[in-house]
Structures are given as C-alpha cells and as structure tokens.
Amino acid sequence: MLTRIFIRDKLVLSKIRKGKEMLKNIICIILAWLQTAGFSVLNYLKPNETQTIGVNKFVEHQIFEGFGTSSAWWSQTIDNEETAREIARLLYDDETGLGLDIYRYNIGGGEKENPATRIGDVNRRTESFYVLNEKTGKYEYDFTRDANARRMLDMAVEYGAKEVILFCNSPHFSMTESGQASGGLTEYASNLPKENYAAFVDYVLTIADWFVEQGYPVTAISPINEPQWKWGGDWVGQEGCHYSADETVAVLELFALEMQKRNSPYKLSGPESGQLSPEYYEYIDKFFASDILNEFCDTYSGHSYWIDNNLWVKTDVGNKFAEQYPEKKLEMSEWCELPLKIDSTAIDSGLYMANIIAQDLNLMNAVSWQSWTAVNGDGLMELINGELVIYNRYYAYKHFASFIKPGMARIDIMDSLKGESKVVSTAFTDGKETVLVLINNEETSQLIDLYGSYSSTEMYLTDEMNNCNKIYSGNFFRETTLPARSITTIVLTK
C-alpha cells in the first residue's frame, strides 16, 4: 500500500520558527521511510514551498516498445548518398544519434505517376511499386522504384532500426473510386469500393512479403491512416482515404483473415486514428467489438494531433484503455506540432515536444511513440541549401529515445504538488537503471534534492546553451539544479 505524506511548510514553520535544523531532520526521516517503502524521492525546492515526488519502483505501468519516426514525405527527396547516411546516423545510431528503434516506411499510393493527380505539392506525390504495363494493360510490381526512399530505409536498418512498419495513407490510385489517392470527389466518402477490398489486401501483403523476403525487419503493416478525416472534395493536399468506423473494421478484418491464411510474420496495426478524443471513440469501440480484430490485434494505434496539452482528454484516453481494454495496448504512431507556430531552432520547440511525449507516456500509457516527419520544417531536422539544420526538437527527443529503451517499464511517480507545478516528469526502469526525464517549464531554476540508494549518476541537459550535453557522470549525489526552461535526463544506476 502506498502512503502519501505532504509537508505544508507554513504550518510546520510556524511551529518551529527557531528550529530550522529540526525541520530538516524531520524531512530526512520521512524521506528515509519512503525509501524503505520502495520510493526514490525528489524534492523540487522553490521559495517558500517544497515539492516532493516519489518514484515507486514497485508500481509498473506499460512496458515500452520503442521510439521512431516516419519516412514521409522527405526520404524520396534525398538524392545525395552521403546526406542520406548522415541522416540515418543522426536518427538511428545508438552512440552518436538518437538511437531510434522504429522506422515507418510509406507504401505510396502512386500519385507521382498518376496523370489525374490533383496534389499540388510534388513532394507529397508518392512513387509506387505498382505500375501499369502499357503493353499488357495490367498492373505489375517493380521493386526498383522509390529508390531514394528504399536507400533511406536500408541505411536506417544499417544504423540500428530494429522494427520497420509499412504504412499506407491511401490504396493505390488505380483501386480508388475517384482514380486518385488523394481522396474521393466528395468529402467524407470512402474512396475504396467494396469490390476492391480484396485487391487492396493482396497489394499491401504482396509488398510486405517482398520486404520480408529481402530481410527487412518488418514487424507490422498499417493499411489505413486517419480514417475519420474528410479526405477529398476540394481539399487534396496529400494522399488519404476516408473510412467510416464500420468500413474501417470491414477492411481490417479482411487483412486479418488473409494474414492468418498466409501465416504472415508481421502484425496488423491500425487504424492510426487521426485524433484520440471522445468524439472518435466509436472507432476504438467498433475495432475491439470485432471478434476477428479483437483476437488478432493486441494494439490500437492513434495519432496525438489536436489534443496537445489537453490533459483531460489524454487522461480519459488512458483510463478508457485501462478500464475497458486492459489486455490491449495503445501506440502513439504519429505527432508533429500542428499548426507549426514555434521557432524550430528555439528551446520553446523542444520544451513543447518534450511535454507532449511525457503526456502521451504518462497519461495515455503509450507503449511506443513515433514522430511524424524526421526531415522537414516541422520535424527533427531540415535540409536547407544542401546543409542539415538540426532543430531543438531533435535534442528534446534525444532525452527520451537515447535512454528509454524497449523492455523498460514506466514506474509510478507520486507528486505532492500535482497540478500546481510546471515541472513535468516521467520515469522508466529495467531493474538496473532508472531513467528520469525532468522538464522544467518554469522561468526560474529548480533545486532538486534527490534521495535514493544509487551507486552512480549521469545527467544530460538541454536549455538555451546545451543540446542534450552530458553535464555530469560519476558518483551519486543528492542535490542538483534544473535550469530555467530546460530538459534534464538523469540516469541512475544501482
């Protein structure tokens, strides 16, 4: 049983005005008691108040499965091999990069070769493996295509990507009602006719099987992406396809049945809900109400858009899963700042992203977390005039991805000033190391008194002057300071 102890300083100090040392001793006794109960305790000391955070190693939440990013829509634009290799290193190398685990490869809908395309941005017109043989009039597979994107995938795997997820934003344009992969001619109408469901299933699985045969670590396919959005009509900014909740289930059930027949060595991921909030719970409920999907799928994937810093919604999502689907997992498969307003080079952007990651891990119990785009203005870095510019979001992401590894468990944190402090924290452990990520959103520095039994400590800092720099490595010590508006990762070893 866990016991909270709160120290109300005004009351205590009024009784022992002449005994500051006595107060210090009382606090130390309390901290020692908490430690014997399985807590590690952090005190955030601000003028006239004490914030006590207990990290309880005995209360575990989700087992983490990995961090990642997506290949869309930048990987096909990287023509220079040296640049591609540098990007792969920065993203996936454990020693000198982020050490990401997951690479999301986009199976494009073929708008690059579609003469009827209405997508204006050429970078959002994808090249497909599924091409028309003009001599026979039939579609065939050509896996030499999408060469730049495939090279980026090769390098990501070479540098350490352990999982590849193949995802579609739309079926191939030749299978759609409108003849375009950018959605239907009217809003909120599915662009995939029922008579083409089976063809779409075969198309995705054929491509996935080819990647598996080539030795890629394909762990999942994700054939549907953000089904609830209107996709089509007058707005055709990218590839996409609307599905109602019932249509989503019908398509994914066919995938599950065919994958069972083929004994596919990868999972079915879906439906990549474009927003996780109560008005779209119908998609979750109907997904798991399907006997086929409930048996075949252990995870529901969604995107963390449009609910940034909405703690109520994220808590509700986490509670819903814990209460209604206790045997299922939630993965956060896509996020970027929408709309992009914050200067990507400023600490503000790093703090913003770090807070979103912590919210999704703590409140929604996400078992994995993946950013939408790695190389773009709203991504982790950007290629400008041939030079890679590393954004502050990259360093914020590093505070999580380089230290919280697959297999680690998120552990409980007890906070005496929950809801009142601007210091956000999350904690993970593998039993030997405990990783604390501390985000100080305050305009002032925060003194920490870290009470625990550890042999060594490493600390990494991002603020106005540091970019996830190691600022300490050595014997464990109790007191340190979180600089104003900063992200600190503390690695504690028993």
What are the language-model segments listed below?
Residues 50-219, 223, 239-243, 249, ...:
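N-terminal catalytic cores of secreted or lumenal carbohydrate-active enzymes
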Residues 329-402, 412-416:
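Aromatic/acidic polysaccharide-binding cleft in carbohydrate-active enzymes
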